[in-house]
């Protein structure tokens, strides 16, 4: 497998790239991350789902920049996956060919179930151990759910409700009265088996909600990954965000680039959380990009070996190599010599 691998998630709202560096058979770490808010799905949902020229050009420009970044970092592999906006578009093949011709980059357009599976794969392997849970990844064009039971991926579904889709079809057109009627049959597509106390939150909208809760509660850590909260305890705060005006969102710790879709994200989140009877929300800092990488790293398996921690393995690979191990007695003696007078230790020790 390549030493450095880039994974690009070509979403309806944003294009994100992560560069991973492999340290050993299963050891790896994130070198850097890039994000461009290109809105590939902009004005597509009220125009027959056809990708618009301005949006395609923004996406092409972002991919050209990402390609330069991969060359700078000397990546040997580049995976680019297209999700909802691309798979829904009648002109998706034209866009994929355009990127191939202009940038020599290959885009793999994945279906909704594959997108759901990749998010579930990342959560299963990279969150603190959990036995059962249902992942929810709210994107710009769709929302994916993955059922995990007894540390196994059981089932995956994709729903045609996303933040950009709802924004263009209902919020921007003032047709809010029709929203409940629109979403009700979509929620009915969620099987009863997906009901779970643990909802694993994936995606920018859900991370923004978790970040706001962390700030409100003066949570001591800045790391969102694996942050957990009880939905009943925080629902009031979430509704305050939902009911606030745009100018007030910054007071809740919501970033400006999230202002125009956070309410749609909250609406989808609360409806699905209620449908699956979720009680605890587990925030995932990983998603489809990590899932794509793990699929390549772990194959033909889907999980790490028993009792294996990829983070610890990475630290071991980076800082405890054989040459450094040989210096341990040397450093130990230096520490002893420096502190022996303070602790009144005899040289014989």
Predicted region positions:
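Conserved ATP-binding subdomain of kinase catalytic cores across diverse folds
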Residues: 25-42, 71
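N-terminal basic/disordered segments at the start of proteins
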Residues: 3-30
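Helical "lid/coupling" subdomains associated with nucleotide-phosphate turnover
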Residues: 19, 43-72, 85-95, 103-125, ...
């Amino acid at each position: 497998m390549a030493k450095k691998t880039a994974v690009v998630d070509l979403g309806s709202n944003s294009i994100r790239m992560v560069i991973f560096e492999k340290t050993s058979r299963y050891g790896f770490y994130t070198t850097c991350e890039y994000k461009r808010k290109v809105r590939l799905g902009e004005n597509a949902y009220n125009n027959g789902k056809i990708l618009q020229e301005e949006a395609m050009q923004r996406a092409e420009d972002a991919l050209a920049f990402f390609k330069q970044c991969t060359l700078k970092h000397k990546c040997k592999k580049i995976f680019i996956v297209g999700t909802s906006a691309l798979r829904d578009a009648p002109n998706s093949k034209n866009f994929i060919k355009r990127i191939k011709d202009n940038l020599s980059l290959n885009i793999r357009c994945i279906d909704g179930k594959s997108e759901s599976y990749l998010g579930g794969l990342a959560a299963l392997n990279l969150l603190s151990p959990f036995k059962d849970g249902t992942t929810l990844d709210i994107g710009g064009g769709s929302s994916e759910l993955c059922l995990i039971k007894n540390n196994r991926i059981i089932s995956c579904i994709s729903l045609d409700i996303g933040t950009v889709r709802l924004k263009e079809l209902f919020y921007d057109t003032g047709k809010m009265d029709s929203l409940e009627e629109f979403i009700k049959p979509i929620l009915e597509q969620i099987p009863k088996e997906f009901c779970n106390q643990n909802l694993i939150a994936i995606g920018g909208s859900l991370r923004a909600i978790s970040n706001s809760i962390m700030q409100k509660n003066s949570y001591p850590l800045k790391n969102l990954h694996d942050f957990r909260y009880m939905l009943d305890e925080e629902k009031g705060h979430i509704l305050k965000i939902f009911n606030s005006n745009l100018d007030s969102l910054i007071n809740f710790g919501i970033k400006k680039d999230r202002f125009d879709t956070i309410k749609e994200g909250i609406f989808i989140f609360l409806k699905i959380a209620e449908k699956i009877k979720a009680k605890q929300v587990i925030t995932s800092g990983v998603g489809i990009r990590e899932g794509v990488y793990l699929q390549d790293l772990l194959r033909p398996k889907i999980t790490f070996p028993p009792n294996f921690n990829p983070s610890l393995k990475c630290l071991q690979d980076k800082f405890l190599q054989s040459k450094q191990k040989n210096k341990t007695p040397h450093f130990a003696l230096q520490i002893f010599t420096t502190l022996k007078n303070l602790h009144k230790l005899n040289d014989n020790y």
